[in-house]
């Protein structure tokens, strides 16, 4: 099954003939620390169709170039594209990279010729899972040695919080989550120092109280990795999800960064999930948020297009939104309206309004068909100065599965 890996972040590229890295999925600020910009895969398959778009030309000099390359297991792959003088985009639709669960990927950018411009970049790739219905859900977080911390299950930066409700994401479709993989950049300290990573869920069955699931793994010093490929968790549209990071037994002497990945197995083949959350969305000024959050506390942007991520051919549908605070302030009718945007100035039909005492909303009727190079984001418009709130959301990305038909030649008897 094919699924899109969306990425992009408003951080200018380094033009000083530098090498920097970013997370292939989601995106964050460019960094020379490759671990903090790597993501661990929970499923095997192929990665292909690299597209990159800049918001300004690479430069005016003949040698001004930015070269983007998928890194796999610490080595450069053949999936690469160069954006040269005067150009604003590049792609590689020729190469396909075989990837295996438990290995890590990152996106490398190398500048050469000292480009005269330092544009922002958006990018996307395609993951083609070996197993039907499977797609990737990846993140990175910061462990907390002093207290249990929480992170979104899809996340672009090494951050976490002790306030779990701030990192909830909401599942937009039915499926199963399995194959938890975790890699630390340092071991937890001295045995028995450890961190336990657990998928948590809230749904109708548990009265929407976030509860530990059986999908969990514990990493004890001196180890730096662990996984749970045994357990799985069934999810439905509207379920809330978080990842807990628990310092076990003693207070660990080290608080490492953690890469983690899950496999999402959709009930409907062709569906993958885009999951996000934000900090306070405001009360007056329209905000634009990346569909997949680079950090749970993001405030997004007040500039249309600045929080966009790059699309490929797919269909978006099933928008679910959850607020931490209802809009009602007692003065008239207040609401927040969430709309999927496809390119600057263009709203799709996918929209939901959360009003008064409501804290949830969805649009399971409308859909939006995307093309290669579309720039997508989530717009929030406020009506009548509603109460400020954190927001969580989920959206389905659908690509029709390729159907293979066996052909048996008809053999004529002579």
Feature-to-residue mapping (PLM):
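Aromatic- and Gly/Pro-enriched, solvent-exposed loop/edge beta-strand patches characteristic
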Residues: 64-131, 193-269, 334-401
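Beta-sheet-rich sandwich/jelly-roll-like modules and their strand-loop junctions
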Residues: 1-68, 111-197, 202, 245-338, ...
